């Protein structure tokens, strides 16, 4: 049977042939049709009776691969999820064969429970291989797969080369996790790729747009603030941070603030509050840089006002201070210039204000381009089979799309400055300021005695004696924070007085009109499409739309490659690309930085591949001697009159299905535990007939203590198990500590986490609390806890907590179950009555009668829950 392949370009065919011949990892530049190649690989091996698995694909990936298969390859992709396919249906489908797109969590459970015949799997195609870690679910799947299937293939794909350079030997580590030896690297500068894309290049017109003078000033001020923040971080944390490559250019990296936070995670409990504030300020300043070229002048001013007004000292704790960058002269200058872009106060004795409403420079350039395209399209003949007159405008995000739609629907040919949509935004801005003013007045002011005391505290205790500076007149230096905040509030109040004057100007300047002067291109050509960049989906949009003109309002190197692939695939289609960017701006620097960084990443990746040691993918157990296996299985922890135990079986741990979202089951399996997935009603991990463990991350612990769920879980564990254990697990690379009592207030309240944990131990004296710094440490703790204990029975563990007549083989859909558990008067004890009482879904639960609710959860709880479902959303008086 001949297999159909749809790969029109030479580099696509070369990648396909290499992956067909050898298992390996393909690292390809983003925008070069990765999903199309993956779909053809799946189609090639999809012979009758084969079982192929697509792993690591998100919803968009599955949809695009399915479209490629159905439209060009005549194959079908089956999506596996718990909502559409039950366990029995999945088992039957696996036996029939086919191509299955399956989530890693479902696949690992099906492999452990033998629902899927591992030895019959033809192969696995993995997407986003750069996300694979040794403790993750994908690495767990590959270990289970290779334990019993030595002949099935593994093909992995990735379009993010930078991730393989994070850490030491990240590429070889990924290959080891995937049991692969070969790496196929295809950057944009690859000879075959370059030849394929340059045979039929698109007509590209670069439009270098100049920033306005006010935007240049604001950009310079923001860079000064970023530099000051980085310098302060370097000064405070030289022992913790790797600052070798720190400069303004490195701050342009899309994940720079995340990298800084990741370096500080392990010592986060030791750094000062000021350091934590500076890390957050980096994210804020980076966002302001992007907003400067994306937001209109009114929205940008509102964003700045929000930041300034949020630093009211009275809203901060006594030991906290506003962001340091807001105290800089550059920040004050930036705020003043941003306000001048919107309106200016006229000179003279009479207070007056003039609305400016500066438009973004790209807007007028976009209008000129559309005018040019409009006239050119009217005169040109179009072949409907090759292209049409549609115009495709690409933006960075949906906000910019909405902004352009508003602009194009209001601007006119005769008056480019007639931005009527800016009028409404300015009115909304003033209304927002008025609401803030009213809210500030409604807040209760502190009593005079407390206010005086606070003032004295600020002036006398705000600065240590050794740090006080002398000022003229012998007075103590006042805090700059207080004065700056007062000046900001005074300035805000002064600007509010100009509101009525500005509104009167606006009403005279922009009177509502009804006419046909609105941008006529939209009326004459209803084929102007405005989209935001959406990854691989942009290829599908280009193929379906077949535009004649593409206007890149915001720069994106990945989309440029997709346009190159589209033009090379269809060389007869007419295509012109307008590439707009702000010359000399951060936008241009970010674009050039991303292109240069990707090229450097591929170059380093090629060098690492040439120097990389050969990865051995053989089964490690083959080289393990019988003596070492014997010694490993001998339990040497003999105490309390115990006997020496020798077993050929691995230690067994029963794991709740929901726990497979975490990395602990994978680590347990890697440490020679036999992991058995099971639907547990009590506990998360069953170590023995006596020991039940409830695992909580820090975030889950806080939520469970707040809503009372942890109390119910401990109550259930205490009822059914002799040794209930609460495991509090921290992240591996984060600080292993809880907030010290010295950071708490003088009077610890009942809602503090420490107080709730104390109350929990008082309520359940038999409860054991185990603190673990990471999942690796948890695995070692489990080994110690299981010493001299019997192995648990899965059937018994699954039946614990069930009422008489209830079946333990039934499974839940987690999303509606979590919603059910969130309803009032539904507890850990009575929710099973709802599940087994004939309530099929949440809709039926909302329509259930009061009488039935009383039968399921009790008279009082049933009456209140019935009333809750019928409570009005709005509180009518």
Curated annotation (Swiss-Prot):
Enzyme Commission (EC) number:
3.1.-.-
According to the record, the residues making up region (Disordered) are 440-490
Q: Which GO terms describe its biological process?
A: double-strand break repair via homologous recombination; double-strand break repair via single-strand annealing; double-strand break repair via single-strand annealing, removal of nonhomologous ends; gene conversion at mating-type locus; mating type switching; nucleotide-excision repair; nucleotide-excision repair involved in interstrand cross-link repair; reciprocal meiotic recombination
From the Swiss-Prot or TrEMBL record, state where the protein is found: Nucleus; Cytoplasm, Cytoskeleton, Microtubule organizing center, Spindle pole body
Mark out the compositionally biased spans (Polar residues). 475-490
For this protein, the record's InterPro entries field holds: ERCC4_domain (IPR006166), Restrct_endonuc-II-like (IPR011335), RuvA_2-like (IPR010994), XPF (IPR006167), XPF_nuclease (IPR047520)
Q: What do the Gene Ontology cellular component annotations say?
A: cytoplasm; mitotic spindle pole body; nucleotide-excision repair factor 1 complex; nucleus
Main location per the UniProt record = nucleus
Using the record's annotations, give every residue carrying the modification Phosphoserine: 71
Tell me which residues make up the ERCC4 domain.
Answer: 652-732
Task: Cite the GO molecular-function annotations of the record.
Answer: 3' overhang single-stranded DNA endodeoxyribonuclease activity; damaged DNA binding; single-stranded DNA binding; single-stranded DNA endodeoxyribonuclease activity
Q: What class of enzyme is it?
A: hydrolase
| Keywords noted in UniProt | Cytoplasm, Cytoskeleton, DNA damage, DNA repair, DNA-binding, Endonuclease, Hydrolase, Nuclease, Nucleus, Phosphoprotein
Q: Where is the composition biased (Basic and acidic residues)?
A: 444-454
Q: Which family does it belong to?
A: Belongs to the XPF family.
Quaternary organization: Heterodimer composed of rad16 and swi10.
What does the record give as the function of this protein? Endonuclease that specifically degrades single-stranded DNA and which is involved in nucleotide excision repair of DNA damaged with UV light, bulky adducts, or cross-linking agents. Required for double strand break-induced interchromosomal gene conversion.
Q: What is this protein called?
A: DNA repair protein rad16
Q: Which organism is it from?
A: Schizosaccharomyces pombe (strain 972 / ATCC 24843)
Q: What is the lineage of its organism?
A: Eukaryota, Fungi, Dikarya, Ascomycota, Taphrinomycotina
